[in-house]
């Protein structure tokens, strides 16, 4: 089969106005970026306020493995399949970060015959949203140092500035730096560092804001430093929010593109799935719901991280509620969770599959604990055997009373996911229960952490290190105790040990640090080592990306 980029390049794309017509978006509401990309105007989005909303479908997954699950591919394939069976459907996805495109991951726009296009533009610069977010974040950093340089009227303690700088690139050399060197004219020297743009709180705020006014208000709440007497200093205090909002004004308009089958997709925002909530923008999701029968969206990593945050943070803040949840699994990944080495995954192994099923089982039960109906989408790989698929369906039916559906959208496009689409419609249009959360926000922050660890991760208890405990007490004292929590831990395990696969139980979840994201509206709980500025691997994807003799991009996935 051709590579993803070869498939994408061979596709005949529709003019973006034709794609917009499927959602009833008029030409005058589009700001075109070439022939196949457009932003949807703020005024048109505001005019949709009060319209009835369609069904929301959340796509999540088992705990990821190096074998791959194909969550974005399934999201795209399901959206295409829903359109094929007569439902007006739109997909809502996160924008890919530039850094990982040149690092380990390569491009991120689905795969095979279930892709969003134009692939090259989506992966490289797109409409400039991430550049706008980087610029807004950098402006805030400049204003903070400028305030300190010119008399420091807010009495900011230069030892307690929390606002690091950002760049949308994997660059380990920037993780820790010394700034303002070279003399008095350059400001006050201090230690600083860079994160990747998707780790910026501006990105999280961008993706949770309801509109421009809400964006500016949330930016103003971001705590960027402390005073000498340990009082919080916000971006509003340094008068940064107006100019930052101006930089973000156009970026906040959702981006409209299409799938290989010409169906609409909204790709907008892209926060980290560990130190942030890992979902596309609220504005894009709401826009999709008001224009389509079905809006299919995904949440980052496995259901223990992505789906939990989608519900406990995004749904809690916005009132959204999924009508159905798809948990993506693969035979390969379940065998890895059952102890099989990656190099041995091609061999049939029903025993390992059954052992690894414990991971899927816990994810299904966790999602059901929120009151949501679930179906399992089994992403088919050509090495899978019929016996393995039959055994997985049997396990799902007998032990979970849930349907598992084999999907072949990677090879067949939407036609390969029609059975999954029919199952999703049946769930979404069936009986719905009230949405429940893993915890109530009125409880103490430590109780919220414990609720997630014990209810969803299978942990016996939590262990909070002294530095984190001191900071939590400060958050409670400063009035932030009512915020939800955003767990930052390894995506590869229910525990904080990435090598502990399957469904471990009885472990301790150790809390190393906590961070306040007051603008986004949550407390980040850091369990283990979390990297906010990735590095490049020994052989980065950038090594093989080039322009060919015809000026076409080669090597991008």
Swiss-Prot record:
GO biological process: tetrahydrofolate interconversion
EC number assigned by the record: 6.3.4.3
A Pfam family matched in the record: FTHFS
Pathways involved: One-carbon metabolism; tetrahydrofolate interconversion
Catalytic activity: (6S)-5,6,7,8-tetrahydrofolate + formate + ATP = (6R)-10-formyltetrahydrofolate + ADP + phosphate
Keywords: ATP-binding, Ligase, Nucleotide-binding, One-carbon metabolism
Binding, ATP: 65-72
InterPro entries, alphabetized: Formate_THF_ligase, Formate_THF_ligase_CS, P-loop_NTPase
Listed transmembrane segments: none
Main enzyme class: ligase
Superkingdom classification of source: Bacteria
GO molecular function: ATP binding; formate-tetrahydrofolate ligase activity
Record keyword rRNA processing present: no
Record family assignment: Belongs to the formate--tetrahydrofolate ligase family.
Assembly mode: Homotetramer.
Protein name: Formate--tetrahydrofolate ligase
Organism for this UniProt entry: Methylorubrum extorquens (strain ATCC 14718 / DSM 1338 / JCM 2805 / NCIMB 9133 / AM1)
Gene that specifies this protein: fhs
């Amino acid at each position: 089969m051709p590579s993803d980029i070869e498939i994408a390049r061979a596709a005949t794309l529709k003019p973006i106005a034709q794609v917009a017509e499927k959602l009833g978006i008029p030409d005058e509401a589009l700001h075109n970026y070439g022939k196949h990309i457009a932003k949807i105007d703020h005024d048109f989005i505001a005019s949709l306020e009060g319209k009835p909303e369609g069904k929301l479908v959340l796509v999540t997954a088992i705990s990821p493995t190096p074998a791959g699950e194909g969550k974005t591919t399934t999201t795209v394939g399901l959206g295409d399949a829903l359109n094929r069976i007569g439902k007006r459907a739109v997909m809502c996805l996160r924008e890919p970060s530039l850094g990982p495109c040149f690092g380990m991951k390569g491009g991120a726009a689905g795969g095979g015959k279930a892709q969003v296009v134009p692939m090259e533009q989506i992966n490289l610069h797109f409409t400039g949203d991430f550049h706008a977010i980087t610029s807004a974040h950098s402006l805030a950093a400049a204003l903070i140092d400028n305030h300190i340089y010119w008399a420091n009227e807010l009495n900011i303690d230069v030892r307690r500035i929390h606002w690091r700088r950002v760049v949308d690139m994997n660059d380990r050399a920037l993780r820790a730096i010394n700034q303002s060197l070279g003399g008095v004219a350059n400001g006050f020297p201090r230690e600083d560092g860079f994160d990747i743009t998707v780790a910026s709180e501006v990105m999280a705020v961008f993706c949770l804001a309801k509109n421009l006014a809400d964006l500016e208000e949330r930016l103003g709440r971001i705590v960027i430093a402390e005073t000498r007497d340990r009082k919080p200093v916000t971006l509003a205090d340094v008068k940064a929010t107006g100019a930052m909002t101006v930089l973000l004004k156009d970026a906040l308009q959702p981006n409209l593109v299409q799938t290989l089958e010409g169906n609409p997709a909204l790709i907008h925002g892209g926060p980290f799935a560990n130190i942030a909530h890992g979902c596309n923008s609220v504005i894009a999701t709401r826009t999709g719901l008001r224009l389509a029968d079905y809006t299919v969206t995904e949440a980052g990593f496995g259901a223990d991280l992505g789906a939990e945050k989608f519900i406990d943070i995004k749904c809690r803040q916005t009132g959204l509620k999924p009508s159905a949840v798809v948990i993506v699994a693969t035979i390969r990944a379940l065998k890895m969770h059952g102890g099989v080495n990656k190099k041995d995954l091609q061999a049939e192994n029903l025993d390992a599959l059954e052992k690894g099923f414990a991971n899927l089982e816990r994810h299904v039960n966790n999602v059901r604990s929120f009151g949501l109906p679930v179906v399992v989408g089994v992403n088919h790989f050509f090495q899978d055997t019929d016996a393995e698929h039959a055994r997985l369906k049997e396990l799902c039916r007998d032990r979970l009373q849930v349907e598992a559906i084999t999907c072949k959208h990677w090879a067949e496009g939407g036609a390969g996911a029609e059975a999954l689409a029919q199952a999703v419609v049946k769930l979404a249009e069936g009986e719905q229960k009230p949405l429940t959360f893993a915890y109530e926000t009125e409880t103490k922050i430590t109780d919220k952490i414990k609720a997630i660890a014990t209810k969803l991760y299978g942990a016996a208890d939590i262990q909070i290190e002294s530095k984190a405990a001191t900071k939590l007490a400060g958050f409670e004292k400063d009035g932030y105790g009512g915020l939800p929590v955003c767990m930052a831990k390894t995506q590869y395990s229910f525990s904080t040990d990435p090598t502990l696969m399957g469904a471990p139980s009885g472990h301790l979840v150790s809390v190393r640090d906590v961070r306040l994201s007051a603008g986004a509206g949550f407390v980040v709980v850091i369990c283990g080592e979390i990297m906010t500025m990735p590095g490049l691997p020994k052989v980065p994807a950038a090594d093989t990306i080039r322009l060919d003799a015809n000026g076409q991009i080669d090597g991008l996935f």
